[in-house]
């Protein structure tokens, strides 16, 4: 789906041809077209699993399209060419019939001109893949991923279930799965730990899980606590030097608590 550049080689072949009663030089011009697919460069594929993502946000724009081999490797089944002008509602309405109304739970959707490839394995959603503008959690999480890794390819999964985690785990090209949800207060109840264990142990993914937005111990959190997951908490900024965590306690890694996110 990438527009491949064409290198045109002009070969001039001069041949003397003997014609009846005279000699003439005939110039033969042969055009040879060689297609060269530009390299993607160094990258990693990160799979945020969250509420949805605002694919219309300027933060996710990309002035190129991904190469066919990458899209085929991720199992893309559908392309949505997004409307680029107007409010979120105006653009959604313009693309509704051709895109959002026809996406199914088995589709993997690529939006050319963005960094986003997305899927919604759960059917219980009003608009597949898209984030509710009044929510924005998945959009913000993905923005933080790109702040840390500007060259990341985003394989976004909408949902909070084992099926959502496994949709990312089953992708051979996905490197990292990141989740930022769970029970309030890190109540030690079953969550997605079975699916993240499969993702890490069986499929060799890296899983990072956010701690709860309280000082509750991260080790008991179903997302951040398992030994195969990397638990992330937030710390107070400025001169705190990570001494005061604001989101979970006893994490594996403390990250900055406040960022300017989309």
Describe every region a protein language model picked out:
Residues 133-140, 153-231, 239-241:
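Substrate-binding/access-modulating region of protease and related hydrolase catalytic domains
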Residues 1-36:
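Secretory targeting signatures
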Residues 36-144, 152, 172, 230, ...:
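Active-site core segment of subtilase-fold serine proteases
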Residues 38-42, 147-149, 170-172, 199-202, ...:
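Extracellular/periplasmic catalytic domains that process cell-envelope and extracellular macromolecules
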Residues 22-45, 51-59, 189, 198, ...:
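Protease zymogen maturation seam
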Residues 52, 64, 182-184, 213, ...:
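Short glycine-rich anion-binding loops that position phosphate/pyrophosphate groups of nucleotides
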Residues 50, 221-262:
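Extracellular S/T/G-rich loop segment that most often corresponds to the catalytic His/Ser-adjacent loop
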């Amino acid at each position: 789906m990438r527009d491949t550049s064409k290198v045109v080689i002009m070969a001039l072949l001069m041949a003397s041809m003997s014609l009846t009663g005279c000699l003439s030089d005939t110039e033969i011009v042969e055009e040879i077209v060689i297609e060269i697919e530009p390299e993607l460069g160094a990258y990693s594929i990160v799979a945020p699993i969250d509420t949805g993502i605002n694919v219309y946000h300027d933060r996710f724009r990309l002035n190129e399209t991904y190469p066919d081999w990458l899209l085929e490797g991720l199992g893309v089944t559908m392309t949505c060419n997004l409307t680029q002008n107007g409010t979120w509602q105006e653009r959604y309405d313009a693309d509704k019939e051709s895109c959002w109304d026809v996406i199914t739970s088995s589709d993997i959707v690529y939006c050319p001109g963005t960094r986003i490839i997305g899927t919604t394995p759960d059917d219980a959603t009003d608009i597949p893949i898209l984030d509710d503008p009044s929510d924005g959690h998945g959009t913000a999480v993905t923005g933080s991923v790109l702040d840390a890794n500007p060259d990341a390819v985003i394989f976004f999964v909408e949902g909070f279930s084992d099926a959502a985690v496994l949709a990312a785990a089953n992708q051979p090209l996905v490197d990292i799965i990141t989740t930022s949800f769970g029970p309030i207060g890190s109540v030690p109840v079953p969550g997605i730990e079975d699916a993240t264990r499969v993702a890490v142990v069986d499929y060799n993914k890296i899983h990072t899980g956010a701690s709860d937005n309280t000082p509750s111990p991260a080790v008991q959190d179903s997302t951040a606590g398992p030994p195969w997951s990397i638990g992330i908490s937030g710390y107070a900024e400025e001169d705190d030097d990570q001494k005061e965590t604001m989101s979970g306690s006893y994490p594996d890694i403390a990250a900055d608590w406040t960022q300017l996110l989309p």
